[in-house]
Amino acid sequence: MIEREEEVMYPNMFNRDEVFFRLGVEKSEDLLQTLRNVKNPNFQDDKGISYLHRACQAHNVEAIKILLELGANPNINDLQGTSPILEAIGRINENNNEILEIMLQHGLDLEKMEGGMTLKDMIESFKDDEMNKIVKKYYHK
């Protein structure tokens, strides 16, 4: 293990730490407590993948809430230009609507460009009535 900024780093080619790995496979109270104490809620690996990306990939609602409350940026991009919300809603999951609403409550920008269209237009293209209701509730232009 490598020590970096007082956090234990696992030796790997993308500079990912223990929290990063755990977010992908674990939903324990211990992980949530560890998250509450992270120094940088916007941590990104060498590919630009953030803790929030990982929590969204895992559809871990509680981890997402904690990260956003600590100041994680809901509009952060990885190096490919993908924001965390697409990691969640890009795959069918029962938590998608809740995740979308939480992200919007914390400043997710529906006008943000994702793959040549706004996030709002992309979400509407899914033709999911519940998601579209959530978008309508938060979209003010």
Regions found by a protein language model. Name each.
Residues 2-54:
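N-terminal segments that cap or nucleate solenoid repeat domains
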Residues 12-21, 44-51, 77-89, 113-121:
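Ankyrin-repeat boundary/"N-cap" motif
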Residues 23-24, 56, 89, 124:
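Specific position within ankyrin or ankyrin-like helical repeats
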Residues 110-140:
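Leucine-rich solenoid repeat scaffolds
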